[in-house]
UniProtKB/Swiss-Prot annotation:
Homology family: Belongs to the SecD/SecF family. SecD subfamily.
Domain of life, per lineage: Bacteria
PANTHER family: PROTEIN TRANSLOCASE SUBUNIT SECD, PROTEIN-EXPORT MEMBRANE PROTEIN SEC
Organism: Petrotoga mobilis (strain DSM 10674 / SJ95)
Subcellular compartments: Cell inner membrane
UniProt-recorded name of the protein: Protein translocase subunit SecD
SUPFAM superfamilies documented for this protein: Multidrug efflux transporter AcrB transmembrane domain (SSF82866)
Major subcellular site: membrane
Gene3D superfamilies: 3.30.1360.200, 3.30.70.3400, Multidrug efflux transporter AcrB transmembrane domain
GO biological process, one term: protein transport by the Sec complex
Stretches of the chain forming a coiled coil according to its record: none
Annotated function: Part of the Sec protein translocase complex. Interacts with the SecYEG preprotein conducting channel. SecDF uses the proton motive force (PMF) to complete protein translocation after the ATP-dependent function of SecA.
Bilayer topology: Multi-pass membrane protein
Encoding gene per record: secD
Amino acid sequence: MRNRRIRILFTVIVFVFALLGLILPLSGNVNDISILRFFPNINLGLDIQGGVLLEYSFDVPEGVNTSEVVDNVITVLRRRMDNAGYTEAIVSEVVSGGESRVRVEIPGISDTQRAEELIGSKGKLYFAEVLEVVESTTTPEITRNRTIQINGEEIEMYSYVKDSNNPNLWYRVKNVFEFGDAPFQITGLDVTDAVASLNSQGAGFVVNLNFSNEGRQKFELATANLVNERIAIILDDEVIIAPVVRERISQGRAEISGIESMEEAQNIAVLIKSGNLPVDLVKYQERTLGPTLGRDIVTTIINAGIIGLIIVMIYMIIFYRWMGVIADIALIYNTFLLMGILSWTGAILTLPGIAGIILTFGTTVDGNIIIYERIKEELRIGRPPLTAVKFGFNKVFSTIFDANITTILAGLVLFFVTSGSIRGFAVTLIIGVLGAMFTNLVVSRLLLESTSHFLKPEKYVKGIVVEKGGTK
């Protein structure tokens, strides 16, 4: 009795957990495609709702671990997508022909310009002392230069950097500040936050920077020694702004002004907050996918799946009577469980993923048929309904378990060796089969044991009926 209560409680908790994943506002998605409109928390892939796919290649410096570079690139790009509001974007590694590339999939957008600006920019921010400004149609040459080592990195003391708005305007800058006890740099690592806003002092937009404690001390030291001189704020080897220092700045804040649009200001803020890319990215491919084709296909697939599901449910009731009703309840339970887990985990639902869901319907029904045929055999030899149910489940447990585990292993292989939409199929297959195994072995058993008195053993008994301890 105690075990049965535990199973009831566990079954209810799992169902409530899945249901909460479907009804709680976990995301801001608005799915308006067929029945998916009732599951707004499920993230849809590019092949369903359309979007942009961008893929980038890169060169790894000799002696540097490729895996570490890939992980760093993915981490930085993931932060950039989140900070830019593309929270549903997928950033992943793609390996082809022994070459690693990074793929970024952004559902629901059609304009690639901003995405390319965010992804393709290296995001390297630093401050430098301006020594002179020259005009030239080509890159000026540094006649005398030297390097200095800071934190194990060799840095050129001087360089020419072009203006972001005027390609013929060049700043000769000193990349290292030589004030205080030791030379130092002020980089994006010293910035804790960057916020885009309207310029309250004049036209245009600004990006407000907040420094860390160490960054504040560096910036205060630099500005104290450069009063009436210019400091350049450089992003991706372009001078964004080079203001004149009027006084020592000790508040730990700086401002990038002169930005023409809010979008540009937001992009700069995102790049600064997200950190530097360890390598330069080169665009390998770009695809823009419209949502119309995906929606039409999804609607067709879902409608076909619903029709097939109804036919299967009717079939189960006709051939298995009350056990068929239990099978249908288990099927609905598994559907909610699968959708709930997809919502909670944030997994991306793709067209192959929908095919995986439909496949799990068959897995759930197939498992129930195996169990019910075994129960019918137990009823035929005269076992009472409740005993027949218990014997039936006990005897097919290993069969159901082994069959589902085999399918799950195949799904795991697909998940780890593939990418994109095929991985989406693997995800829904694994979740669906796990749900099918749970509903077959726990939910269906609980319901059948609780309602075994609805079974009609006389429909299955043939010949001599065997009772406990003798014959009749």
